[in-house]
């Protein structure tokens, strides 16, 4: 676990839920797990990182600032319930001890493995069209789930990414709102959903389903790949 990784907290989740509810019909369809607000803190340079857990005075100062700031937003802007500083602090004192054996300098650990000619695999999640810069903005995630994200996320140079493999479903899916030109709002879509067990891994929501969009595949391949694999749906 990288020491520089930002921590997602209960106030991120509370803000995510409040912000999404306030948008009405303009909802993006987030998982409401606080990912966006956590990334916002990172960009605003007020995020709390794993390494802060091991300097408790620094952690307490950062947590106090964040709780005060987030509670103002929750109560004054969104008319929502505030979060409790003491409860969060008590939780993270326990988390710090439990996580300590797993915290390391992942950048150097990965680079060391590469230089020792060990096999290193970076596995991405989500999809190209959810990329913050290259996806269907604003209906995107907060990070970069493309090949370049492996380099920046792991902290190794792009020259170390020797082979980039892409996996494409034989049909298209989407969770949440956003454009979906080939979506099938009919029996075909239902069959694809049933056949592929297409339900969100976090929310359990039924995924939107439709035909494979080769223009999207071409676009994604240009952004990412040296090899592509199309998965074949099979019946249970």
Listing of model-derived features with the role each one plays in the protein:
Residues 1-7, 232-235:
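Short, small-residue-biased leader/transition segments that mark boundaries at the very start
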Residues 3-4, 8-109, 113, 120:
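Internal alpha/beta core interface subdomains
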Residues 9-15, 43-45, 131-135, 140-142, ...:
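Short acidic, glycine/serine/threonine-rich loops at helix termini
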Residues 52-59, 135-165:
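Gly/Ser/Thr-rich active-site loops/lids in small-molecule metabolic enzymes
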Residues 65, 69-72, 91, 109-112, ...:
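Alpha-helical scaffold segments in soluble metabolic enzymes
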Residues 99-145, 154:
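Acidic catalytic cores of enzymes that act on phosphate-bearing nucleotides/polynucleotides
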Residues 150-227, 231:
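A glycine- and small/hydrophobic-rich beta-loop-beta segment
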């Amino acid at each position: 676990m990288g020491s520089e990784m930002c921590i997602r907290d209960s106030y991120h989740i509370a803000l995510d839920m409040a912000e999404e509810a306030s948008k009405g019909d303009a909802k993006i369809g987030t998982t409401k797990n606080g990912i966006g607000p956590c990334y916002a803190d990172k960009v605003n340079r007020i995020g709390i990182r794993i390494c802060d857990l091991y300097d408790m005075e620094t952690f307490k100062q950062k947590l106090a600032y964040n709780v005060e700031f987030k509670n103002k937003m929750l109560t004054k802007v969104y008319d929502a319930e505030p979060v409790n500083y003491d409860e969060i602090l008590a939780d993270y004192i326990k988390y710090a001890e439990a996580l300590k054996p797993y915290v390391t300098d992942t950048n150097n650990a990965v680079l060391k493995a590469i230089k020792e000619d060990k096999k290193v695999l970076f596995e991405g999640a989500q999809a190209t069209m959810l990329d913050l810069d290259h996806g269907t903005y604003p209906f995107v995630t907060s990070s970069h789930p493309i090949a370049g994200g492996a380099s920046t996320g792991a902290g190794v140079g792009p020259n170390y990414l020797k082979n980039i493999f892409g996996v494409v479903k034989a049909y298209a899916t989407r969770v949440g709102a956003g454009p979906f030109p080939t979506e099938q709002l009919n029996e075909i879509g239902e069959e694809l959903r049933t056949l592929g067990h297409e339900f969100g891994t976090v929310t359990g929501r039924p995924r939107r389903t439709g035909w494979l969009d080769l223009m999207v595949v071409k676009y994604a391949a240009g952004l990412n790949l040296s090899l592509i694999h199309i998965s074949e749906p099979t019946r249970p």
